[in-house]
Regions:
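Structured, acidic catalytic/metal-binding patches in enzyme active sites
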Residues: 20-284
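Sec-dependent signal peptide recognition
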Residues: 1-7
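N-terminal signal peptide c-region/cleavage motif recognized by signal peptidases
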Residues: 13-15
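C-terminal soluble interaction/assembly domains
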Residues: 282-346
Length: 346
């Protein structure tokens, strides 16, 4: 679900507000390239060392073959609506068009009029008397300032921090402020893939129920997982983010250097919040990646055995020993990388 954490380790915000930094000039990139000057030499060396330790850390496009020879494909997405991210390689687009099934993390199209009505009322997104307030979660005060500014920018008002439930707040934090400019006009890459599949006659498979994330966080009651997710995603609101940082993170994605993106997150939280940062990230990843990967695989298994599936999930779901590449191999599938032009070699 995460895109990247475009922050230099150790850089904390000045007086700039969390919403005002996300201007069109910062957000709408003309090109993506790595800017090595944004890293200290020591940080970059540690980043390279850590990324080399992450299994299956290079590549976005993978062929999946069952023991009976049925072929499917998996693509690591970036949850972004930038044209450079929406511009998929021809080989990927052709595979989507030919797919029997296009599977995405969540199919958010409404299935009934009742679901549509419920999505507009949002009554369960308001905090009741039994739920903890985000202000009482003992989070760093700077994070609360960034969150409050973000909520104001989204139109929730300056009191939303007090009346939204922890689950609703965590879910709202998932949206990148830089996506605001094209919201409702340009789809994020995942939604474009789903749309292409639908246009070309593919069946759409939702790998997870639409409200699964919200329900998980609601059941958590604002405890460990929800608090950790709020802390992690509040850091995406850091006003220290620059266009060079965003350019670098997008370049790493387009070059298939996914392990470096994940290592960047790890090192940032270890250095910026040495006491709690690693635990925040670990708790978040344990659910968003590790636990949900098992759900995704279970949802797709029968169709993968038959073949013809194009599975599109956030690119962080692919690497690591708990990633989908490793889980698919453990389940008996052959998983081979399809290297694309411009991507790095392992």
């Amino acid at each position: 679900m995460r895109l990247w954490l475009a922050l230099i380790a150790g850089v904390l915000a000045g007086p700039t507000h969390a919403q005002t930094w996300a201007t069109r000039e910062v957000c709408l990139l003309d090109e993506a390239r790595v800017h090595p000057e944004i890293f200290t030499p020591a940080f970059y060396a540690n980043l390279q060392t850590r990324s080399a330790e992450i299994p299956n850390s290079v590549g976005r496009f993978w062929r999946i073959t069952s023991v009976d020879g049925a072929v499917s494909h998996m693509w690591g997405t970036m949850h972004s609506s930038l044209p450079m991210i929406l511009r998929l390689p021809n080989q990927v687009t052709d595979t989507i068009k030919a797919a029997r099934i296009v599977a995405t993390e969540v199919d958010y199209t409404q299935q009934t009029r009742e679901e549509l009505s419920a999505s507009h009322t949002s009554s369960d997104r308001y905090r009741d008397a039994t739920e903890i307030s985000v202000r009482d979660m003992a989070l760093p005060s700077q994070l609360l300032i960034w969150i409050e500014e973000r909520l104001i920018g989204l139109g929730w008002g300056d009191e939303a921090l007090d009346y939204l439930s922890p689950a609703a707040l965590a879910e709202l934090m998932l949206a990148d402020p830089c996506g605001d400019f094209a919201a409702g006009i340009y789809p994020i890459q995942d939604d474009r893939i789903q749309m292409l599949g639908a246009i070309h006659g593919s069946k759409i498979l939702s790998l997870e129920a639409p409200r699964a994330l919200f329900q998980k966080l609601s059941d958590d009651g604002g405890a460990g997982l929800t608090r950790a997710m709020i802390a992690v995603y509040a850091n995406y609101l850091n006003p220290a983010i620059t266009q060079e940082m965003r350019s670098t993170s997008h370049a790493l994605y387009l070059q298939g250097r996914i392990g470096e993106m994940m290592a960047w997150d790890e090192l940032y939280f270890s250095e910026a919040y040495p006491e709690e940062g690693p635990d925040w990230l670990a708790r978040t990843n344990d659910y968003l990646l590790r636990e949900r990967n098992e759900v995704f695989l279970g949802s797709a298994m029968a169709d993968l055995l038959e073949g013809g599936v194009f599975m599109a999930v956030g690119t962080y779901h692919l690497p690591q020993e708990y990633g989908l590449i490793a889980l698919l191999r453990k389940a008996g599938f052959a998983v081979e990388r399809i290297a694309l032009e411009g991507e790095a070699r392992p």
